[in-house]
């Protein structure tokens, strides 16, 4: 995918290209900003602008080389006000040592030194130039370079390196941050080559809805296996749940041992009583006054 005048190390693997296409990183919006035209491949009949995925990979490599050139990893600030990118920037920060700002960007973070959250990064990376406009604006005041994930309709003012990609889908955002982190680690020497398997899966960078996860856990807990799932043989032997092994030979149903013990105890009590209870009771004294 790299031009012929660049070394082969810039070439993307077929797996990387397939992942970018599967995550729909090439699908832009219906609007096109004039500065994003060089990254456009074509416009579909339905009006969707398709991004050149080769340009996306070139900009990921360029951005990674800029990040790796900074001596102190903590001087890189990764920012995402969009919920779909907050998990990705936190994971990127934990793997590369950058400083993450997930959620609302406090005005004055880069310009007001009196605030407790004041920072002086050497580079910032934003997920969306539109939602992270405050961070880009303050970075322009203090001459901080900006790398941004830009869609076809994203404003590119004060953006130094634009990575053309779909910045609205959760999978596209997570994959680009994952590829960027992997490329930074490769340049730092943590990973030997791109073909080296990274033990961090891309799913960790994807956004996960907390409410959906709670609903899924509740549904899994309340689910009880039915006869179709367990089988008729287990039902006949007394299977009522998943707390005992129905496949074990001679397995007894839960509660059968307690019922047998209760029956034995009842027989013992009758043997000990052995007589008429009414005959053993003392006759009341007729002269007693109550």
Curated annotation (Swiss-Prot):
GO cellular component assignments: cytosolic small ribosomal subunit
Family that this chain belongs to: Belongs to the universal ribosomal protein uS2 family.
GO molecular function: structural constituent of ribosome
UniProt record, GO biological process: ribosomal small subunit assembly; translation
Comp. bias regions, Low complexity: 263-282
Localization of this protein: Cytoplasm
TM helices/strands, residue ranges: none
Key words, A-Z: Cytoplasm, Ribonucleoprotein, Ribosomal protein
CDD domains xref list: RPS2
Subunit structure: Component of the small ribosomal subunit. Mature ribosomes consist of a small (40S) and a large (60S) subunit. The 40S subunit contains about 33 different proteins and 1 molecule of RNA (18S). The 60S subunit contains about 49 different proteins and 3 molecules of RNA (25S, 5.8S and 5S). Interacts with rps21.
UniProt superkingdom: Eukaryota
Gene source species: Talaromyces stipitatus (strain ATCC 10500 / CBS 375.48 / QM 6759 / NRRL 1006)
Gene (name only): rps0
Chain spans, region Disordered: 263-290
PROSITE patterns per UniProt: RIBOSOMAL_S2_2
Record InterPro entries: Ribosomal_uS2 (IPR001865), Ribosomal_uS2_C (IPR032281), Ribosomal_uS2_CS (IPR018130), Ribosomal_uS2_euk (IPR027498), Ribosomal_uS2_euk/arc (IPR005707), Ribosomal_uS2_flav_dom_sf (IPR023591)
Function: Required for the assembly and/or stability of the 40S ribosomal subunit. Required for the processing of the 20S rRNA-precursor to mature 18S rRNA in a late step of the maturation of 40S ribosomal subunits.
Name of the protein this chain belongs to: Small ribosomal subunit protein uS2
